Amino acid sequence: MSITAQSVYRDTGNFFRNQFMTILLISLLCAFITVVLGHVFSPSDAQLAQLNDGVPVSGSSGLFDLVQNMSPEQQQILLQASAASTFSGLIGNAILAGGVILIIQLVSAGQRVSALRAIGASAPILPKLFILIFLTTLLVQIGIMLVVVPGIIMAILLALAPVMLVQDKMGVFASMRSSMRLTWANMRLVAPAVLSWLLAKTLLLLFASSFAALTPEIGAVLANTLSNLISAVLLIYLFRLYMLIRQ
């Protein structure tokens, strides 16, 4: 059977509309979890204020130069802030991926579903999803730091891994290998969706500062919720595409 991107887009749009409230609640809940965890593990405001003390920002030629000019205490604060942001984001993304994929599975099986039920049902696979998303994020970030293009290619090749991990109960590395092979064979169907997702995420990041006009916390929750909705659309598309490819 010939698969067209247009038909998968249409199926994705229909599912997203029909399950919008459930997906919105999961996106909001994951955003709240991300913001709360980030706040709990981040350095205090007083510690963050120390990052500006005695650091010649204008004279620094780059990020590494800026970090080298920091005191050991400032470097530790920066590391803690970065780790808190990364950890909270990974937790939120793992719960989002697990919840959205379980929604699709439950709805496809004709069962009634709620946001909490989907998240609860995904609990057993969350540790593997966390490791998978961590490794994927690491590889993509390394690729982007090198010349950008390798990072984008890795994001495309590993896009199907979360779906395969949950749907076929694969291991972390098996799902990554299988995703690379399957995506490479269906690049014309996967690449446009992932590139659109990356573009939407980038645009959201550019306008994220405007959300802080409310309060930093509410703005962060709103920005993360929108980001999660964008990721949910991609997950729905990838799940539908994967099921069609397997037929």
Curated annotation (Swiss-Prot):
Please tell me one Gene Ontology term that the record gives under cellular component: plasma membrane
Q: Where is the signal peptide?
A: none
Could you list which ranges are Periplasmic topological domains? Answer: 41-86, 141-151, 210-224
Q: Where mainly located?
A: membrane
Q: Matching InterPro entries, A to Z?
A: UPF0259
Residue ranges annotated as Cytoplasmic topological domain = 1-19, 108-117, 173-186, 246-247
Q: Which Pfam families does UniProt cross-reference here? A: UPF0259 (PF06790)
- What membrane topology term does the record carry? Multi-pass membrane protein
Tell me where it resides: Cell inner membrane
Q: Which UniProt keywords apply?
A: Cell inner membrane, Cell membrane, Membrane, Transmembrane, Transmembrane helix
Q: Which domain of life is it from?
A: Bacteria
- Segments spanning the bilayer are 20-40, 87-107, 118-140, 152-172, 187-209, 225-245
Name the protein family.
Belongs to the UPF0259 family.
Q: What is this protein called?
A: UPF0259 membrane protein YciC
